[in-house]
Structures are given as C-alpha cells and as structure tokens.
C-alpha cells in the first residue's frame, strides 16, 4: 500500500509553490507557512496568498521582525486570522530560540503557537523526512476508506482510530514521498464526491462505500 502511494506521487505529484528542493534554504519556512495557511483552507485559495506573503516576507527572520499589522494586512481575505497571529508569534520564537530554524521533534513543534498534532506531523514528514502522521481532511478521508471505518470523520473516537491506523501504515523509509502522495491522493482522486476509484492505486482496499459515492 505504501509503495503504490509513493510510486503514484513520484509519477503524478502536484506542482505547488511550497514544494521546493529538500536542500533549499527556504524549505522549512515554506513548509511551516504553508501548513498554517492550509488549515481549513483549500490549496487553490492559499496559493496566491502564499506567493504574495513570501515575496514580502521571504524567510523566518523577516516575518519575525515585521509588525503584526503588516502580517494581518497581507492575510486579509484568507480568514481565520488567529492563524496569522500564531505564525507571527511562532516566527518570533523561532528567531529567538531556534536561530530561525525549526525544532525537529513532535513535542517541541507542538509547543509552538497554533501547531497541533497533524501540523507537527506534516512538518516532521515533509520538512525533515522523519516519521510523522498527517490527519488533514483529505488524508482522513483516504484512511477512512482504506480501513473500512464508517464513523463520522471528525468524531474524537474516529480520529483516535485513524491515528492508530496511520501509525500502522507509516513506512520505514521515504516518509516525505508517502505523506505527500497520501495528501495528493485525497485531493485529486479520493475526493469527497465522485472519487475516481478506477485511477486509485489502492482502490482494491476501498470499502464499497467509496464506490457507491461515484454514482
């Protein structure tokens, strides 16, 4: 399962402005900024805001040293303004305590303002190539269908069981490709309605519910 998800990502990955080379000096900044912006917001909405934001604040240091008013001004229209306040606070902490870099443990990441379990998992996996569990809406939908779990997505009990299932699926290598492949699968193939099961690399693992949703 993990291999076919990674293979599909290698051959069909989306081109997104925050997906830069792993050796890029902007990698970690782009990753944490995009994760904040993508919380409860679709990719197509985030892209122009991300590009404008990074042209004004190209790194953690520049973001940390600007005023909150400037941050909120660029964030205007994206909504959920607590995210803007939290990324500004986080940038200040990263500049002061982490030399404008990011901590690389789940515990330290979750100490930063606005970063929960899933966002920390995304940073670990995509920013550091370490094991990290991502449970955004797209990934949760894929995992629900793969596991045959029919419970409502956002129930505490459901999230707990999905977290355990996600741990089982974590590969031993290539964490970044697997995580990005899982997110891309949920965004482009395993959609909420009319999923394209005939194009899914793990369609044989889907429950009959996913097929029913195509009709």
Regions found by a protein language model. Name each.
Residues 1-7, 206-211:
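Conserved small/polar residues in nucleotide/adenosyl-binding loops
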Residues 8-196, 202-205:
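Catalytic cores of DNA base-excision repair glycosylases
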Residues 65, 211-212:
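Intrinsic disorder/low-complexity segments
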Residues 215:
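Post-transcriptional modification and biogenesis factors for structured RNAs
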